[in-house]
């Protein structure tokens, strides 16, 4: 019988086993990603888009790319902000009800007003060691913050000028893969089948952010872009009967552009939460309070009707409430991406 020498052979075996496990896990991840891919012949990309995007591998896709619709602007026609500047809240000129997206990383709080994001849709930023992208799709009223560190890449995102289900399709400048903004999934290109990490953020008012973070910083108005910041080109949109550039079915029992709160793969009608003020969904606590203007109502954003602020938090074992990722989007958007899933609060049996 062969006797193993502990001080050499056993550690080598353990290291080998660990490496095998890591490689196995990586292999499983690769298989999981590849399992989402369609056969290249069913990607159905148009020759026009292929010509405009020569560096995107459209043979790798997770959806039927014939679902893609042009939003009008070309690639980067809606320019992302890649070197954002910030100012102190005392230097900013916003009404208390002005809507913004806020994040807190490494103890530093920053705010991104929708009056700026509505014209740029993506801000590529970092705080300390955390690189992230703040994104907003006006046609879906969907705000999502993504981690930019992804595998071996630190991704920078731009706008394709394309939409799917009326939702922004982003691309990364490292691989030119296309990403669905609503869920952070790569739908075409080298990274197709992979998903971005969604980070906690809030969609709240200037007053609420200022009260929570008086020393926080706010995105400065870009000086190198000529846009009518503070004005929305989508005035009256969230009171419309039908969504723009959307061809899918609509949800039953609720208006297509009624707001819903999406958290933990559930959608709750905003009017249901507004009536209750507070709801418990498993380990998630949702609260609503008034004081935030809609960015898609009046031409002057700060004059938009009050749609209020939603906070989504999880109670940890020690009782502390921590923010979790959530979305406040439109009912048709939830239905487009989750056609078989109900919206809670629409009927009496969906409570």
Predicted regions and their residues:
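Bacterial N-terminal signal peptides
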Residues: 13-26
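Sec/Tat signal peptide C-region and signal peptidase I cleavage site
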Residues: 28-32
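Mid-to-C-terminal functional-domain signal that highlights helix-capping/loop sites
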Residues: 33-351
């Amino acid at each position: 019988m062969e006797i193993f020498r502990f001080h050499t052979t056993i550690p080598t075996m353990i290291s080998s086993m660990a490496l095998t496990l890591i490689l196995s896990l990586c292999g499983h991840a690769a298989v999981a990603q590849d399992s989402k891919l369609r056969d290249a012949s069913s990607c159905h990309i148009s020759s026009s888009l292929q010509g405009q995007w020569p560096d995107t591998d459209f043979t790798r896709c997770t959806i039927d790319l014939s679902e893609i619709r042009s939003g009008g602007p070309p690639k980067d026609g809606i320019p992302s902000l890649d070197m954002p500047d910030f100012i102190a809240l005392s230097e900013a000129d916003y009404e208390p009800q002005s809507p913004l997206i806020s994040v807190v990383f490494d103890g530093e709080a920053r705010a991104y007003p929708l009056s700026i994001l509505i014209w740029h849709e993506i801000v590529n930023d970092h705080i300390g060691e955390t690189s992230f992208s703040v994104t907003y799709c006006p046609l879906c009223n969907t705000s999502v913050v993504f981690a930019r560190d992804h595998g071996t890449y630190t991704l920078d995102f731009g706008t394709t000028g394309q939409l799917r289900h009326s939702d922004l399709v982003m691309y990364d400048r490292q691989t030119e893969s296309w990403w669905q903004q609503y869920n952070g999934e790569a739908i075409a290109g080298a990274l197709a089948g992979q998903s971005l990490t969604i980070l906690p953020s809030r969609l709240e008012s200037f007053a609420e952010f200022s009260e929570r973070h008086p020393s926080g910083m706010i995105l400065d108005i870009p000086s190198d872009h000529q846009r009518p910041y503070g004005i929305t080109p989508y005035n009256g949109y969230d009171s419309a009967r039908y969504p723009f550039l959307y061809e899918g079915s609509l949800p039953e029992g609720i208006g297509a552009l009624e707001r819903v709160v999406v958290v933990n793969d559930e959608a709750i009608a905003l009017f249901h939460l507004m009536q209750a003020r507070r709801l418990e969904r498993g380990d998630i606590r949702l609260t609503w309070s008034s004081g935030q203007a809609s960015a898609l109502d009046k031409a002057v954003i700060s004059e938009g009707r009050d749609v209020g602020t939603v906070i989504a938090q999880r109670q940890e074992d020690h009782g502390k409430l921590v923010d979790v990722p959530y979305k406040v989007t439109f009912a048709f958007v939830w239905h487009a991406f989750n056609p078989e899933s109900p919206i809670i609060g629409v009927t009496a049996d969906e409570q």
